[in-house]
Each structure stands twice: as C-alpha cells, then as structure tokens.
Amino acid sequence: MMKSIPVWKQELSDGVHAARLASLYCCAPAETASKAARYAAVLDGLEKTFGFHAEAGLYSAPGRTEIGGNHTDHQHGRVLAGSVNIDMIAAAAPNDKNQLRVQSEGYDLCVIDLNDLEARKDEENTTAALLRGECAAFAQRGAKLAGLDVYISSNVPKGSGVSSSAAFEVLIGVILNDCFMTEKVSPIAIAQIGQWAENVYFGKPCGLMDQMASSVGNIITIDFASPAKPVVEPVAVDFSKAGLALCILDSGADHADLTDEYAAIPAECRAVAAVCGGEVLRDVPFETFLAKLPECRRQCGDRAVLRAFHVYADNDRVAKQVAALHDGDFDTFLCLVNESGRSSWEYLQNVIPAGYKEHQEVGVTIAAAKHLLGDKGAVRVHGGGFAGTVQAFVPVEMLDEFKAGMEAILGEGRCHVLSIRPEGGAVL
C-alpha cells in the first residue's frame, strides 16, 4: 500500500501503527518506538539513495527457525518451523526507468533491467540472480512489472541460521505481489517463487522450508509430499507459557565456500532414492530402502546411506513433535529435539565440514550448550548446518545464566533470544 512519505513518517511518529508493530515484533505497543524508527529510517534511505518519491510502501519479511525436520524438505518430507521476531524491512517506490533497483544497507546497489528476465549463468550466486528470477516468476503469473526502487534494512544476521536469504526472497516477493499483481498470490506461492529463483537462477538446490516459514509465518508444520501443493497446518503453541525460551546461538563459523557441502546432501539422498526406484526418499518406503541397503552402499557410499537413515527418522520425528505439542507434552517434545540433533551430527553429518580439523565451531557450540543445560532443555544444529547456528530450548529460569555462559565462550551478542512472530511476509 503506497502513501506519501511525509504521511508515513507522521503516522510512525504518532504511534498510529503501534499495535501492528507490537504484533510483528512480539512486544508491547509502548515498546514500538524503536521499531517505528527503523521504518522511518528506510524511508530516509530510499530518498537519499534514489531521490524524491511522491509515495512509497513499507514491507517486512521475518527470519525463520527450523524446529523439526533437518534437511527433510528437499526429500519431500515433513518439517516443523516458525517465523521469528527479527526481520528484513523495506521501503519501495515506483521509478520511470523500467528497472528494479535494490539497495540493501551495507551492500552494492543491484539493478535489474525488466526487459531482460532470462537466467544468466554468469549471475549465479548473486543477488541479481534472485531478483531477476523472482521478477521472471511474477511476470509468468501475469504481473505487469514496472520500474521500482527498493531500500532494505535487516536485523537478520547473514549466515545466522535464521535464513537471511529466504527473508530477502520473501520480502521481494511481498513487494512485487503488492505492487504489480492485480490478483494477489498466496504466501505459499510467494515462498515457491523464492525457491524457484534460488534453484533456477541463483543455482542453489535448496528446499522450500525456509521460504515457507518466512512467508506463511507463526509455527507451522509442512508436508512436502506434493511440493507443488504442500500441506501447511498451524501448530498452536506458546513456548513462553511452557517455561521455555528459544535461543539461536551464533557459532561464528562462516558459510563461505560451503555450497558444495550443502549441495551434497540432497544429491546423495536423491542418489539413494534412485537406486531404490524413486526420485526422492519420500518416494521410497523405508522397508524398500532397507532391502536395497547393500546396493545403496555399493553405488552411493556409506555417507549417503547414513544421511538417508537420518532423513527417514527425522521425517517421522516431525509428526511425533507435532503430536507432542498438540498434547502439551513438552518433555517428549524436548526429547525429540535432542534426538534430531544427535541424528544430524552422527548420521546426516552436517555439523562439521568434511576435512575440517581446527575449525569445528558448530560442534563446540553444541557441546558447550549441552554442558550448560545438563539434562534440561534441548540443543540441535539449526538449519543447513556446517556453519552458522545452533538452536537451544532453554528453561526460562536458566536463561540468564545460559546466555552469559554461551557468550563468555562465543562472544558478546552471539546468543539471540527470539520469539515466534505471528505473521509472515507483511505489508505495513
């Protein structure tokens, strides 16, 4: 929704949007002044970067937390995930240049010619590829694209394990949907567009969980048995009422140069599925996999087989986690989270990159968190793994001590205490 920039700024200053911001950021309306100031700042950034605009729109897309189903999405499995109260926000306004111009704070300006939306090999692994791919996808759905200037600010740390890339894709999707689609596409479709752009234009074979959690919002369970029509169901749970805090621990490891590690997981799982007569593991009954185990080992190698064991088990765990949450059985839920974490490390092997000896940051983070929690709470690798973050569910009475202990090991600001955001991609 477009408004004049002075009107936006006055409304933000006067607290007109306080209730909306309180919902998005899981805080009281009286605590939203700093949130409103962020939106005023992106309006300033828009004008400083691109010059005067008569009107603009304001948008938000949250980071996400994966709660269950580690690397199950690309095998058409089940996941449990939620949106969190850190996000990317943007101000967007029309331009007359037939270009999509995107300025993210701290990055170079990215410009896409809307007359040229074909995928480019030399653009793979770049922001331009994601933008071009999303524009192409919306154009295919009937969007009448026109010039647009976008200024983005983020408090979703890159490589943080809460998926800054998915938040970016969803944010662009929300903007394009609001500005150019007469018949709006659904949050599910926005997620699918982001995944398609990342797969086809960016060149990364990601699953759909990250984009779906950011786009749909709140806590959801998703069944990807039919990827074109994933089944999305809300899961009503309030971790704070259960006495649990959600912490995301930044291990300090870098995602750089790990694309091959990530890509190997779906590739190896698909190789196992192929031996068993399927395309992905969801196509293959577990009993068939067991019967074909010797052949899978010969053709795919033992690491691929162990990864398949993980995917089957974690897929089943998601259903058990959802049932436990529905029943309010948090002890069982936490046991399942810990089981998933052990399986990821031992079978999926996405905690330590192959051959790394001196740098095993995610492993150290898990070990330290488990030591501080003892037999309480739960700890697991978070998201894609290898680098980035660890997830911990911490009893609230232990939170201050846990946070201080982890930051003494990892560094100040490395323990993020988050809340589940009730809404996904949003137009303010």
Go through each PLM region and give its residues:
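DPxDG-like acidic metal-binding loop motif
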Residues: 83-85, 162-182
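Beta-strand segments within the central parallel beta-sheet cores of soluble alpha/beta enzyme folds
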Residues: 101-103, 147-154, 184-196, 334-339, ...
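Glycine- and acidic-rich phosphate- and metal-coordinating loops
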Residues: 135-157
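Phosphate-handling active-site elements
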Residues: 140-148, 176-190, 396-409
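Glycine/serine-rich anion-binding loops at beta->alpha junctions
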Residues: 60-76, 155-171, 375-393
